[in-house]
């Protein structure tokens, strides 16, 4: 089932297959307003932040054309420097629906005069999200619509509810077949700047409440950052290019 509604802040595109239910806030960087599995909410939403004009710090923001902070708050492109904030510019964009089916949706957004003040390129971002019985597939692409080379990175920043990071069981597999366990993770770093797992293919997390989350990186996304600003409230699993 699919639907388009409004919650007073943003248009919401909704997909529901009876097991998974997803709501996307099109006017708030296409973030997840909700992701429910068998009636249980998986995603953190901060109502005050969501209802504001500030950069989303909840849901699942898109990271483009970079993640994190640039040195001295400046983006260096050739001989030019541009003021840059955290996690790029996509958080200021409104998304529009391209196709909307029973269990999938494709959306896009484009450069604006405002984004060109800090990132002087024409671009198109497209996201395709589809539900299956027990999973969500998120395909995110960036297209250069400028006449010159457009340097960029791409990523996602999903905030998953987690009552106790220290009681979470992590396992995974790298591209070369090596395995990952809790012993490979630095939980102090996770709670500060984040812990980067390079060349990670799969990451599995068993939460204290018994929910198991499995993340399979799609082609082009070769790194995964694990971070938490509140280890008794949420964790972020960032797929990064």
Regions found by a protein language model. Give the residues of each.
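Extended, loop-rich substrate-binding clefts of extracytoplasmic carbohydrate-active enzymes
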Residues: 1-7, 16, 78-133
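Beta-strand-rich N-terminal accessory domains
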Residues: 1-74, 81, 199-219
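Hydrophobic residues embedded in beta-strands of well-ordered beta-sheets
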Residues: 13, 104-105, 136-138, 203
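Acidic, contiguous internal or C-terminal segments within carbohydrate-active enzymes
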Residues: 15, 26, 109-152, 156-158, ...
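Structural motif
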Residues: 21, 74, 81, 104, ...
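A short, structured loop/turn motif at beta-sheet edges
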Residues: 98-105, 130-135, 162-168, 208, ...
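Active-site/ligand-binding surface loops and adjacent short beta/alpha elements
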Residues: 148-153, 158-220
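Active-site pocket scaffolds in enzymes
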Residues: 212-241
